[in-house]
Regions:
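Active-site capping/gating regions of soluble enzymes
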Residues: 379-381
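A conserved active-site cap/scaffold subdomain adjacent to cofactor or substrate pockets
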Residues: 352-360, 371, 376
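Conserved phosphate-binding catalytic cores of ATP/NTP-utilizing and phosphoryl-transfer enzymes
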Residues: 95-103
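Conserved "HGTGT" condensation-loop signature of ketosynthase/thiolase-family condensing enzymes
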Residues: 2-88, 102-110, 114-250, 254-257, ...
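Gly/Pro-rich active-site capping loops and adjacent beta-alpha segments
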Residues: 387-389
Length: 501
């Protein structure tokens, strides 16, 4: 069939998708998992595409890290792509790669791109720190790096011991709760309602989802021995789970190459538009801990490019590492968080499973399958990196993009966002009173409150990060909402502490 006029020759199109969820008792190497997902994507597109792959791009593997993963995957597949790319930390990576490498396809610098990633978090957990099998020999070639490699936290957050996403996202949640006039208990109840539909979606994917079980709002929000409090207001079932053995892959190529290779038209799904924008990079510097301007910019640009509004979108997969990420995305999109279209096509990171930087590859794989089934509909995928820091958004449809493939520049908006960042007081200047902007209480595995990190501002507007290790303060701040209240800072010598007045 000759190409219809509506598809320009260099339009990027996804023609093959594959995923693997490995449930055995054995240990699997992430490279082996990735290769299996890639083979499935090749089979989905038709064997002819394999020898034409000129670029392999791999989101960074976190739990059992492998150096030069793209080169290792290519060698295991016995293909020799000209470019092998691996990426730094960022859950937005797969959608970001669609944008950047789709751009290269559009400009004729790449023809056939394999994006593939994996995590063996479940294997790692079973190994409990023992080395996985044998360390593989080094690959014959090395990867180039693509993406923003800055760390996710500044010295201000690190100085009080904040380091993990599960400690930082609840701080955003407290700011969201306070803005809606809720305390932690009321917020936790609401989050059960928000997340229950995600579990129902996961249950519809028994082959893929790590936890394919539908749960009620109460099951999710009620604190029990099985559902222990992790960091207020998130019990365990509201947290992303990375200890999964999963891989996903998709093949992106120029439309003219897909035609030349005879890829059946019913395989074709187009990225319509793609945009990336960061929030103010470090959480401590963000003027509003309860909102994301980066998602708002990226999503608005992507929708405008497709000449669509949010009402035109049939499916969403909003990045769901923690509930606050979903709430911020829904608000940025002007979307009711309980919209009956649903906010996920997979079940999300807590229930489908959150395989590190590669989760969005699973979103894209499932979105492609839906677009193939309903070719006139459009889906929207968001990906997010670090602490609601880096945002990549894309539109997807089996209908060719009516405006052509659109790469979107967000430089002007990015400069505006960056210029809104707040100053941060040095440790020696963090004295006197401060007003709490966001906080959480971190619990231990026995259900006892352990410590309380806060992000607050001084009378002059500069931000501070402080912590208390007093269990009574933790108890008090868990019982009542402290966002907007005053605390007294004190220098502990090594970090900024605080007390209640």
């Amino acid at each position: 069939v000759p190409m219809p006029m509506s598809v320009e020759a260099r339009t990027p199109v996804v023609v093959g998708v594959g995923d693997v969820t490995h449930r055995g008792d054995d240990f699997v190497d992430p490279i082996d998992l990735a290769v299996e997902a890639a083979r499935r994507a090749v089979k989905d597109a038709g064997r002819a595409v394999e020898r034409r792959i000129d670029t392999v791009a791999t989101p960074g593997i976190l739990v059992i890290p492998r150096d030069n993963p793209a080169s290792r995957i290519a060698e295991a597949m016995r293909i020799s792509p000209a470019r092998r790319i691996s990426c730094p930390v960022g859950g937005n990576t797969p959608q970001y790669l669609v944008e950047v490498l789709g751009g290269e396809i559009g400009e004729g610098r790449a023809d056939v791109v394999l994006v593939v990633g994996a995590e063996s978090g479940h294997s790692a957990r079973k190994l409990q720190g023992r080395a996985l099998l044998d360390s593989p020999p080094p690959p014959r070639s090395s990867d180039e790096s693509l993406g923003d490699a800055r760390p996710g936290l500044s010295q201000a957050e690190l100085s009080v011991g904040l380091s993990w996403p599960h400690e930082v996202y609840p701080i955003f949640e407290s700011a969201i709760a306070a803005r809606h006039g809720r305390d932690f208990d009321a917020q936790r109840e609401w989050l059960g309602t928000l997340m229950a539909p995600f579990t129902a979606e996961a249950a519809r994917h028994p082959q893929q989802a790590w936890f394919p079980r539908s749960r009620s709002a109460t099951e999710l929000s009620e604190v029990t021995a099985e559902n222990r409090m992790v960091c207020l207001p998130y019990p365990k079932l509201l947290n992303s789970i990375m200890s999964v053995d999963m891989a996903a892959a998709f093949i992106l190529m120029a439309a003219e190459v897909a035609d030349e290779l005879g890829v059946a038209r019913d395989r074709w799904v187009f990225p319509w538009s793609a945009a990336t924008c960061n929030d103010v990079y470090f959480p401590v510097e963000r003027p509003d801990l309860s909102r994301s301007s980066g998602i708002e910019v990226a999503a608005r640009k992507a929708l405008n490019a497709g000449r669509l509004t949010i009402d035109d979108i049939r499916w969403f997969d909003l990045y769901s590492c923690f509930p606050s990420a979903i709430e911020m995305a829904a608000e940025a999109l002007d979307l009711d968080p309980l919209d009956d279209r649903g906010l996920t096509v997979t079940g999300g990171l807590p229930y489908h499973g959150g395989p590190g930087n590669n989760y969005v590859s699973h979103s894209i794989v499932e979105m492609v399958r839906r677009c193939r089934r309903d070719p006139t509909d459009v889906g929207l995928v968001t990906g997010l990196g670090w602490y609601s820091t880096k945002h990549s958004v894309g539109l997807w449809s089996a209908t060719p993009p009516p405006t052509g493939w659109r790469l979107l520049d967000t430089a002007v908006e990015q400069a505006q966002i960056d210029s809104s960042r707040l100053g941060v007081a040095g440790v020696d200047e963090a004295t006197g009173c401060a007003t709490v902007d966001g906080y959480t209480v971190v619990y231990d595995r026995d259900g006892q409150p352990r410590w309380t990190p806060i992000i607050a501002h001084l009378y002059d507007g500069r931000r501070v990060v402080a912590r208390s290790d007093d269990p009574q303060i933790a108890e008090a701040m868990g019982a009542e909402m402290y966002v907007g209240k005053t605390v007294c800072l004190r220098d502990t010598g090594s970090f900024t502490g605080f007390e209640l007045p």
